[in-house]
């Protein structure tokens, strides 16, 4: 099984177990841990945020991008609007150096946000300002200027930011989302707790992303665990 294949609309439940079984001999290596974390992030973003067409692309020449995907937020927004009424949204929202048209005013059933994901499988280190700057550079290299407002840069890490890191993240002139996804835990018997660990714990948008995704209801969707009801349909 190729771990760099495209996961179209769902993440097979046995993917992580298959990866672990196929790579048991290198389970203590950083390569194993890195790929396991990338697959864990794919699982959580597909199951909780309903991203689609996700592909692990990380490698020597990945340009700082580990995973690519597409995000149709419309089903999430429609589901959450059945429970929450949002205030009227202006046609454009101001940012420090520009203004943007919120995605809510542009979204259509077949319109997707392009997502670029970078994973930091840290055990204890926090995300620094230098790493945020590198992430901004990766976005600038990968995304043409004309697509900057229809693309999202996502950083996933099991740890949070340093003070400098969160400041630069918030001030970045690109739409950025941070998802805190825990790593899969290894049990005392050497097995991996795929079912109960490796979960999405935190979702955070910088100022640019919060304006772009205004009234889409993503944070409300997660708080109310909307993904549980949608998964049952």
From Swiss-Prot:
Keyword Mitochondrion in annotation = yes
- Give GO MF terms, alphabetically: nucleic acid binding
This protein's superkingdom? Eukaryota
Cell location: Mitochondrion
Q: Which InterPro entries match?
A: RRG7, tRNA_endonuc-like_dom_sf
Q: What does UniProt give as GO cellular component?
A: mitochondrion
Coiled coil residues, start to end: none
Cited PANTHER family = REQUIRED FOR RESPIRATORY GROWTH PROTEIN 7, MITOCHONDRIAL
Q: Which family does it belong to?
A: Belongs to the RRG7 family.
**Name of the protein in question:** Required for respiratory growth protein 7, mitochondrial
Native species: Kluyveromyces lactis (strain ATCC 8585 / CBS 2359 / DSM 70799 / NBRC 1267 / NRRL Y-1140 / WM37) (Yeast)
Gene that this sequence comes from: RRG7
């Amino acid at each position: 099984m190729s771990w760099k294949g495209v996961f179209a609309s769902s993440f097979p439940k046995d993917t992580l177990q298959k990866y672990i079984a196929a790579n048991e001999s290198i389970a203590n290596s950083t390569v194993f841990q890195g790929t396991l974390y990338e697959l864990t992030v794919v699982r959580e973003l597909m199951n909780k945020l309903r991203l689609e067409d996700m592909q692990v692309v990380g490698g020597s020449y990945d340009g700082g991008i580990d995973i690519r995907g597409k995000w149709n937020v419309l089903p999430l927004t429609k589901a959450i609007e059945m429970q929450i009424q949002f205030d009227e949204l202006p046609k454009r929202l101001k940012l420090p150096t520009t203004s943007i048209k919120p995605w809510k005013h542009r979204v259509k059933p077949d319109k997707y946000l392009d997502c670029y994901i970078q994973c930091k499988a840290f055990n204890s280190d926090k995300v620094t300002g230098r790493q945020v700057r590198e992430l901004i550079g990766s976005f600038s290299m990968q995304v043409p200027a004309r697509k900057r407002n229809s693309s999202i840069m996502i950083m996933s890490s099991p740890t949070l930011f340093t003070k400098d890191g969160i400041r630069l993240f918030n001030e970045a002139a690109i739409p950025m989302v941070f998802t805190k996804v825990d790593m899969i835990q290894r049990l005392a018997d050497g097995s991996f707790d795929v079912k109960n660990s490796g979960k999405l714990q935190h979702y955070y948008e910088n100022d640019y992303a919060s304006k772009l995704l205004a009234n889409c209801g993503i944070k409300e969707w997660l708080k109310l665990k909307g993904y549980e009801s949608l998964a049952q349909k």
